[in-house]
Amino acid sequence: MTSPGTDAVSAACFERARARIPGGVNSPVRAFRAVGGTPRFIQSGAGPYLVDVDGNRYVDLVCSWGPLILGHAHPAVVAAVKQAAERGTSFGAPTEAEIEMAEEIARRVPAVEMIRLVNSGTEATMSALRLARAYTNRPLVVKFAGCYHGHVDALLSAAGSGVATLGLPGTPGVTPGQAAETIVLPYNDIDAVRTAFERYGGEIACVIVEAAAANMGVVPPEPGFNRALADIAHENGALLVLDEVLTGFRVSSAGWWGRDPVAADLFTFGKVIGGGLPIGAFGGRRDIMQLLAPAGTVYQAGTLSGNPVAVAAGLATLRESTPDIYARLDHVAAVLARALRDEFGRIGLPHQVQQAGNLFSVFFTTEPVRNYAQATGQEAWRYPPFFHALLDRGVHPPPSVYEAWFVSAAHDDAAVNQILDALPAAVRAAADARPPG
């Protein structure tokens, strides 16, 4: 392994990939379009580190976009995956491990009385919307600009994550009818929610919101915002769906619910509960969940739902995630966020470093960011040189200013110090940047 140097093999892989894979990647943000340069093709990961196909090693601040709270290739997770795979990779039949996962989630989040396992966070939110519409017999959904809930057609309007990264208002292929059934409101604006319910209340099936927004950069909910959403929805016969795909079991042992226990009607999960393998889940009130087939008439199914290898990886991750693990996650995030603030402050560059638990991100702006308009109004052109200065020094942050930074409990002092050593040059690169054109 070497310090970051050549990217020749990654460049060759990228060229080869573009011949057969649209854009050369299987998820848009991976293509480095927002930061420029060659995306790094990864060969392996261990603890807090990634190694690319050129042999360069990086401290990882992406962590597979959130699932890897224990770090890469944690021995307990690897052993669980190996043991499960040796028993069979898929059965198309129920397993006891699925029950254990459902029980573990319900134990951690008591508001989740029943749960259904699926294959991705997108599938979880898609299914939760179908269930909410069936339960209420209403068509409309309220979402918030900048919140990302996967690539569900009805939820891609003014979405965060890759949609924000690519500067898209939405996406072709979403029909006007689907878009018309989605009411998009400013995040953290409870008055806008009240106004929407005054106008459309009898037609709104649910409000869906990230438990803490982290796909337009990290924008935590204002105190009481999620609770007010629940109150307004319930006053009008609608449901609240809390999307914990990203925050679930990362920001605490009970996810965001552990920090702000708002009893939503439905929750969605993913990422951590798969330990790095594909999985998702949605759950909530028993009377709502029992509408799902075969108990009820709302159809939802999946060939690989509850996959035994993914469930094994997720259970191992959850069982290894002791209070000390969460304390380490919080400590590392706090150290890095403080260092970013100090370095930006020392150089006098306008900035906001915002946190939601151990999630954090940088905004190049003078005022705290509360919503999507403010997030997209920042000097985002400062991020590419900032990113590449870190990458050149062996630190791999997210390749978009609109994504959260993720740490793991495997980020030891050596890894943290490598990040701290890289920050001065990165902040200087951001300060020296000039707007395009």
Curated annotation (Swiss-Prot):
<dbReference type="InterPro" id="IPR049704">
    <property type="entry name" value="Aminotrans_3_PPA_site"/>
</dbReference>
<dbReference type="InterPro" id="IPR015424">
    <property type="entry name" value="PyrdxlP-dep_Trfase"/>
</dbReference>
<dbReference type="GO" id="GO:0006782">
    <property type="term" value="P:protoporphyrinogen IX biosynthetic process"/>
</dbReference>
<dbReference type="InterPro" id="IPR015422">
    <property type="entry name" value="PyrdxlP-dep_Trfase_small"/>
</dbReference>
<protein>
    <recommendedName>
        <fullName>Glutamate-1-semialdehyde 2,1-aminomutase</fullName>
        <ecNumber>5.4.3.8</ecNumber>
    </recommendedName>
</protein>
<dbReference type="GO" id="GO:0008483">
    <property type="term" value="F:transaminase activity"/>
</dbReference>
<comment type="similarity">
    <text>Belongs to the class-III pyridoxal-phosphate-dependent aminotransferase family. HemL subfamily.</text>
</comment>
<dbReference type="GO" id="GO:0030170">
    <property type="term" value="F:pyridoxal phosphate binding"/>
</dbReference>
<dbReference type="InterPro" id="IPR004639">
    <property type="entry name" value="4pyrrol_synth_GluAld_NH2Trfase"/>
</dbReference>
<keyword id="KW-0627">Porphyrin biosynthesis</keyword>
<dbReference type="InterPro" id="IPR005814">
    <property type="entry name" value="Aminotrans_3"/>
</dbReference>
<keyword id="KW-0963">Cytoplasm</keyword>
<keyword id="KW-0663">Pyridoxal phosphate</keyword>
<dbReference type="GO" id="GO:0005737">
    <property type="term" value="C:cytoplasm"/>
</dbReference>
<dbReference type="Pfam" id="PF00202">
    <property type="entry name" value="Aminotran_3"/>
</dbReference>
<feature type="modified residue" description="N6-(pyridoxal phosphate)lysine">
    <location>
        <position position="271"/>
    </location>
</feature>
<dbReference type="GO" id="GO:0042286">
    <property type="term" value="F:glutamate-1-semialdehyde 2,1-aminomutase activity"/>
</dbReference>
<comment type="pathway">
    <text>Porphyrin-containing compound metabolism; protoporphyrin-IX biosynthesis; 5-aminolevulinate from L-glutamyl-tRNA(Glu): step 2/2.</text>
</comment>
<dbReference type="InterPro" id="IPR015421">
    <property type="entry name" value="PyrdxlP-dep_Trfase_major"/>
</dbReference>
<comment type="subunit">
    <text>Homodimer.</text>
</comment>
<keyword id="KW-0413">Isomerase</keyword>
